[in-house]
Amino acid sequence: MSHKYSHPSHSDWEAVIGLEIHVELNTKSKLFSVAPNHFGDEPNTNITEVCTGMPGSLPVLNKEAVRKAVQFGCAIQAEVAKFSKFDRKSYFYPDSPRNFQITQYDQPIVKGGTVIAEVNGKEKSFAVNRVHLEDDAGMLKHFSTFAGVDYNRAGSPLIEIVSEPCIHTPEEAVAYAMAIKAILQYIDASDCNMEEGSLRIDTNISVRLKGEQGLRNKIEIKNMNSFSFMELAIKSEINRQIQAYLSHPTKPHDQIIAQATYRWDPEKQETVLMRRKESADDYRYFPEPDLVPIILTDSYIEEIRQSLPELPLQRERRYTKEMGLSAHQAFALTSDKALADYFEEALKTCSNSRSLSNWLLVEFPGRLKEGGQNVKSINLPPSHIASLINLIEKGTITGKIAKSVADEMVAQPGKDPAEIVAGNPDYQPLNDQNEVERYVDQVLAENNQSIVDYRAGRDKAFAYLVGQVMKLCKGKASPSLVNELLKQKIANLP
């Protein structure tokens, strides 16, 4: 059973969306055992008796996982519970060797909280319901004639971040999830690698008529390992539900949409039914008898709160207020901690923050996109980009030449731009004003109509003249000098 994506929607309806974000914490060991918490190793090598649920094995709580959960709670201004406990969530599946998951049901470690995200250029607040600790399941792998289970992931520490049903569009859902990801990376709680499963997102979606109170039956969607797939899946499901209600205007709501779990098939671009939705009763929650409650002191929580690093929103506001970056530039830089850190490092030797931002967000990504790389993955030192911008600022090279130098920097990542410029005669600036004047005179002699148009107030005509001069001198002349000479000579023409 599947549902093809098509464009929604109906103006009388609104979506109600809640997200459950599962985050694998980057602790050295697992949540309840000393087994390594590491992705990509040979199957079933990072396991102990606790991971595989052997009789007599007992869990021991990883205190670093608790600390990271508290860090996140403090980062979103939530209430960190001084008393929380673990529970067993029972279900039967091959990747769960104990036939239950250790999670937190009614007394989670974090309650409430607020996440501020940028949606269409504006800040919007989203409410978090809870954050709880739990251990991960193993991985079921299907082969041609059999299925195998890799328990390396079993027991890895997770926090599940549950939002309130306060999200109403796919764009809001993506913005909220990206803000969560950025916070987690800034506090070093997780690498949030969606391809490796460090960040997994489930969405709960229902629709209702605008102004209607209460919630209708919801659909859960799993298997969204990118933000673009997530946005597509949500759009698809919103449209499906609206069409279902419009097609059956007289039927009771709960007979039109039944609670169920779907998965997103990225190849077919459609949602596929997995199973009818279970209720909390189906999981038979009860307190975990082998673990004592988590009891935290005020001083422990406050110490973690005071040790928080600068968070994405704080850094974004600093970039706009102190550096004069646009809101878009600041958001784009701070959404990726590695990129923001790279920017900060380059700023130590670069005088122009706006120019640096433009090169990091536009010029270099455009050159690296085809190879799926970025400035860090090709080992391009921050000081080299700073050096390139400084060469432009000093007038040593023009912006056009800088782009050619950037091409060589990408091709030879370890080479300093000053060295590249010094070794190529074509990159030497044209400082002879008399020679530049000859180019200007030639362009003016060949483009009388552009002179007439410029005098008539058409700025594009002047830009064309500048471009022609720069073309003749192969981009080596100073644009400001070319501008000055053109204006002087045009003013003196009869």
Curated annotation (Swiss-Prot):
Record text on subunit structure and interactions:
Heterotrimer of A, B and C subunits.
What reaction gets catalysed by this protein? L-glutamyl-tRNA(Gln) + L-glutamine + ATP + H2O = L-glutaminyl-tRNA(Gln) + L-glutamate + ADP + phosphate + H(+); L-aspartyl-tRNA(Asn) + L-glutamine + ATP + H2O = L-asparaginyl-tRNA(Asn) + L-glutamate + ADP + phosphate + 2 H(+)
Enzyme Commission (EC) number: 6.3.5.-
Q: Which Pfam families match?
A: GatB_N, GatB_Yqey
Q: Which organism is it from?
A: Protochlamydia amoebophila (strain UWE25)
Q: Which SUPFAM superfamilies match?
A: GatB/YqeY motif (SSF89095), Glutamine synthetase/guanido kinase (SSF55931)
Record-level GO BP terms = glutaminyl-tRNAGln biosynthesis via transamidation; translation
Q: Name one GO molecular function term.
A: asparaginyl-tRNA synthase (glutamine-hydrolyzing) activity
PANTHER family registered for this protein in UniProt:
GLUTAMYL-TRNA GLN AMIDOTRANSFERASE SUBUNIT B MITOCHONDRIAL AND PROKARYOTIC PET112-RELATED (PTHR11659), GLUTAMYL-TRNA(GLN) AMIDOTRANSFERASE SUBUNIT B, MITOCHONDRIAL (PTHR11659:SF0)
Q: Which family does it belong to?
A: Belongs to the GatB/GatE family. GatB subfamily.
**Gene assigned in the entry:** gatB
Q: Which positions make up the signal peptide? A: none
| Class of the enzyme per the UniProt entry, highest EC level | ligase
**Tagged with keyword Ligase:** yes
Keyword Nucleotide-binding, does the record have it?
yes
Q: What does this protein do?
A: Allows the formation of correctly charged Asn-tRNA(Asn) or Gln-tRNA(Gln) through the transamidation of misacylated Asp-tRNA(Asn) or Glu-tRNA(Gln) in organisms which lack either or both of asparaginyl-tRNA or glutaminyl-tRNA synthetases. The reaction takes place in the presence of glutamine and ATP through an activated phospho-Asp-tRNA(Asn) or phospho-Glu-tRNA(Gln).
InterPro entries per the UniProt record, alphabetical = Asn/Gln-tRNA_amidoTrfase_suB/E, Asn/Gln-tRNA_Trfase_suB/E_cat, Asn/Gln_amidotransferase, Asn/Gln_tRNA_amidoTrase-B-like, GatB, GatB_C_1, GatB_Yqey_C_2, Gln-tRNA_amidoTrfase_suB_CS
**Which keywords belong to this entry?**
ATP-binding, Ligase, Nucleotide-binding, Protein biosynthesis
Put simply, this protein is called Aspartyl/glutamyl-tRNA(Asn/Gln) amidotransferase subunit B
Q: What is the lineage of its organism?
A: Bacteria, Pseudomonadati, Chlamydiota, Chlamydiia, Parachlamydiales
